[in-house]
Amino acid sequence: MVLVRGGYKLEKFLQLLTVLLQEAKDPASLLKRLLTILVAVIIFLFVSNTSEVMSFLKTFSTSAVLQDVQTQRIDNFPNVAREKSMVLFSQTGADAVFVVKYKPDAINDYSNIIAWESNAQLDRADLADKAVNKTSELYRRHLEGFNYASDLTVKVNKYMGKNIPSFKNVIFNYIYTCPYFNLNNIYAGYIGIAWRDKPVDIADSEQFKEYLTKLCSPQQRSLGRSI
């Protein structure tokens, strides 16, 4: 029944086009008729495929909005990272707080410092992309969702892999790190809270880590929601 009705409409439409062309008496009239036919064809196709057209427009509109939101989120992420670094720098009294982001997204071949809060100045070389050591204890612990303290005052097996690239102008012997995960729950980078010297004695180490975990947790979540 639907096919018959659709065929009937198409037949009537073709008859209308034939009449319009036959009534053209000169080139100017023919051009006007052709423009009229073009408009008629567009209207006919739209009316005949209303559901498909509306579905396409809805999908296109949704995709465009989502893409725009994602672009704004990416562009604003460094600002969010700087804000979180400032908060933790004030709360912890650390010598430096920084945010590292991995790239390409979900591949994590390189790391880059996108926010830095400290009285120490970073060298330009420290801001360059650094290859990620995925065999390091830091990376493996972060993948599992755990925070990790990199303590250079404790000797470790040299084959474990370097956790954090060295800084050119300053040495940090203790860096507490908190991983953050993006909206797709993919490990995207980490927050580093750094001291030149270990800030507490070994006896207070675990309590100190618990304290840093509490401070870092809301900033981790905020970064994750922003990327």
Curated annotation (Swiss-Prot):
Native species of this protein? Escherichia phage T5
- Transmembrane intervals: 34-48
Cite a single Pfam family from the UniProt record. Phage_holin_T
What InterPro entries does its record include? Phage_T4_GpT_holin
Its domain of life?
Viruses
Please identify the protein, giving its name as recorded. Holin
Any idea what job this protein has? Answer: Accumulates harmlessly in the cytoplasmic membrane until it reaches a critical concentration that triggers the formation of micron-scale pores (holes) causing host cell membrane disruption and endolysin escape into the periplasmic space. Determines the precise timing of host cell lysis. Regulated by specific antiholins that somehow sense superinfections and then delay lysis. Participates with the endolysin and spanin proteins in the sequential events which lead to the programmed host cell lysis releasing the mature viral particles from the host cell.
Q: What induces it?
A: Expressed in the early phase of the viral replicative cycle.
BP GO annotations: viral release from host cell by cytolysis
Could you confirm whether the keyword NAD appears in this record? Answer: no
**HAMAP family reported for this sequence:** HOLIN_T4
Could you give the subunit structure recorded for this chain?
Homomultimer. Heterotetramer composed of 2 holin and 2 antiholin. The holin-antiholin complex binds dsDNA. Interacts (via C-terminus) with antiholin (via C-terminus); this interaction blocks the holin homomultimerization and delays host cell lysis. Interacts (via N-terminus) with the lysis inhibition accessory protein rIII; this interaction stabilizes the holin-antiholin complex thereby resulting in a robust block of the hole formation.
**Bilayer topology:** Single-pass type II membrane protein
Modification comment: Disulfide bond is required for functionality.
Q: Please report which protein family the annotation says this sequence is part of.
A: Belongs to the T4likevirus holin family.
* Keyword annotations: Cytolysis, Disulfide bond, Host cell inner membrane, Host cell lysis by virus, Host cell membrane, Host membrane, Membrane, Signal-anchor, Transmembrane, Transmembrane helix, Viral release from host cell
Main localization, broad class? host cell
Which residue ranges does the entry give as Periplasmic-facing topology? 49-227
Which GO MF terms are attached to this record?
Answer: pore-forming activity
Q: Please provide one cellular component term from the Gene Ontology annotations of this protein.
A: membrane
Comment, domains: The C-terminus serves, in association with the antiholin, as a DNA sensor for lysis inhibition under superinfection conditions.
Q: Is Disulfide bond among the key words of this record?
A: yes
